[in-house]
Amino acid sequence: MDSFNYTTPDYGHYDDKDTLDPNTPVDKTSNTLRVPDILALVIFAVVFLVGVLGNALVVWVTAFEVKRTINAIWFLNLAVADFLSCLALPILFTSIVQHHHWPFGGAACRILPSLILLNMYASILLLATISADRFLLVFKPIWCQNFRGAGLAWIACAVAWGLALLLTIPSFLYRVVREEYFPPKVLCGVDYSHDKQRERAVAVVRLVLGFLWPLLTLTICYTFILLRTWSRRATRSTKTLKVVVAVVASFFIFWLPYQVTGIMMSFLEPSSPTFLLLKKLDSLCVSFAYINCCINPIIYVVAGQGFQGRLRKSLPSLLRNVLTEESVVRESKSFTRSTVDTMAEKTQAV
């Protein structure tokens, strides 16, 4: 990818920050990987092992519960998106090891990176949807009792997947391969044909819909849930606070570098020193974003109960309790203060 201009980011080192500009100077390539690339490879390896196993377990647990619990619908869709994203990691790994050479052909250049992007954005939007559901359970319990059903949950998931698909379309439409000779390699990237306005518009839309809006949803929903929980408990446990901080902070920390570098590069000239520096950090930023795909199962387990209880209980059983427990809407016709507090505490693990 030495001869590529980076523009709007995408997942992989054949990403949307790569545009095909033959006038861009070719960097001198070394057989030694850069330090950011090496760090990215290490992160990808860890995320692959933890993410594939963890999300596969979540899919297995929730698949048996989707017919009777709404929570299982949320977490099944989220785990599927994260699981598919993690399965694509060998593609990114192979590209980095070969100095960003794309060995999979032109059709795969359009399809594979776009599928990666689809699953990643679906994961983000589903996470925001789950947080909104938790908010409604706490603040609109009567409405949830009357209208919160499996059909509505599946519709919400379909909307999240549909919006993720829309965010992915530019990657599919503008992605092409380019053959380079110094050194010999095939590069996969997007070509906006020097249309900077279109490139910047894509970057801004992805930043707003794929990061700022979900982040705002997570922050607002969990802040109000936290305030309600604390205001109605005689003994204010720090457990709820820890879960809220873990969810919001992990999303913000791991996605921020990718989104910031992406929007900056869409507005910078490819020859600028800042652009070239961000280009070298691309692999590391993508790997950080990928951490969010494997961290959710970890949060589920930690939020389930104390460490001693986890040692006495099988992991599948623990996950089943965390992921499929339903609100007290189904158990009671009226929501007392104690039941609302209990539900608010138990539905934080997203």
UniProtKB/Swiss-Prot annotation:
Chief location: membrane
Location(s), subcellular: Cell membrane; Cytoplasmic vesicle
Disulfide bridge map: C109-C188
GO MF term list: complement component C5a receptor activity; G protein-coupled receptor activity
Record bears the keyword Disulfide bond: yes
Post-translational modification: Sulfation plays a critical role in the association of C5aR with C5a, but no significant role in the ability of the receptor to transduce a signal and mobilize calcium in response to a small peptide agonist. Sulfation at Tyr-14 is important for CHIPS binding. Phosphorylated on serine residues in response to C5a binding, resulting in internalization of the receptor and short-term desensitization to C5a.
A GO CC term assigned to this protein in UniProt: apical part of cell
Required for CHIPS binding: annotated span: 10-18
Assembly with partners or alone: Homodimer. May also form higher-order oligomers. Interacts (when phosphorylated) with ARRB1 and ARRB2; the interaction is associated with internalization of C5aR. Interacts (via N-terminal domain) with S.aureus chemotaxis inhibitory protein (CHIPS); the interaction blocks the receptor and may thus inhibit the immune response.
Function: Receptor for the chemotactic and inflammatory peptide anaphylatoxin C5a. The ligand interacts with at least two sites on the receptor: a high-affinity site on the extracellular N-terminus, and a second site in the transmembrane region which activates downstream signaling events. Receptor activation stimulates chemotaxis, granule enzyme release, intracellular calcium release and superoxide anion production.
Name of the protein this chain belongs to: C5a anaphylatoxin chemotactic receptor 1
Lineage of the organism: Eukaryota, Metazoa, Chordata, Craniata, Vertebrata
Chain's gene name: C5AR1
